[in-house]
Amino acid sequence: MAKNAKFRVPFRRRREGKTDFRQRLGLLLSGKPRLVARKSLNNVIAQLMAYDEKGDVVLVSAHSRELVKMGYKGHCGNLPAAYLTGLLLGKKAVKEGAEEAILDKGLHRATKGAAIFAVLKGALDAGMDIPHGDEIIADEERLNGTHVKNYAESLKEDADAYKKQFSKYLEKGLNPEDLPEHVEELKEKILNL
């Protein structure tokens, strides 16, 4: 604890492991809205944030649960869901007139093909202008769910393991082998909003 004048207590959000203030300052100095992408185990959240002295303001937001309302039957925490969430956010942002942004990955490590960069790719495909490097974004096969399809086909021989792994897909009426077509169908639906 703070016992004398030499000890400096870090900001509360830094102590809690929520904010990297050096990175945040760099993003705010750009003067552009921030594309904030966050992933949990079962959901993906994307927001377009603008700075305000009283606190950041959310300009546009998209949640992977919105995809379910649009007819998405896959898992809301996987890579195709992250891509579609970014696409939905980008479409809403372009409609609102916010076509330029900068990616705010927060405390997430920049790993090639991560869900945060799938959100970025979705926003780019919707027509937003966000500075990025192409090598960090996952392949198209992973963004549309072909890797899930390939895994389902390899697991098809063991019926019990297949049913256990893909029980929610089957419960919702979607064969995991049909996921790429389902993602493309939903992509067209979002682009035509």
Swiss-Prot record:
One of its GO terms (biological process) is ribosomal large subunit assembly. One of its GO terms (cellular component) is cytosolic large ribosomal subunit. It holds the Pfam family Ribosomal_L5e. Keywords: Ribonucleoprotein, Ribosomal protein, RNA-binding, rRNA-binding. The keyword Ribonucleoprotein applies. InterPro entries: Rbsml_uL18_euk (IPR005485). One of its GO terms (molecular function) is 5S rRNA binding. It comes from the Archaea. The keyword Ubl conjugation does not apply. This is one of the proteins that bind and probably mediate the attachment of the 5S RNA into the large ribosomal subunit, where it forms part of the central protuberance. Part of the 50S ribosomal subunit. Contacts the 5S and 23S rRNAs. PANTHER family: LARGE RIBOSOMAL SUBUNIT PROTEIN UL18, RIBOSOMAL PROTEIN L5-RELATED. Belongs to the universal ribosomal protein uL18 family. This is Large ribosomal subunit protein uL18. The lineage of its organism: Archaea, Methanobacteriati, Methanobacteriota, Methanomada group, Methanococci. The gene is rpl18.
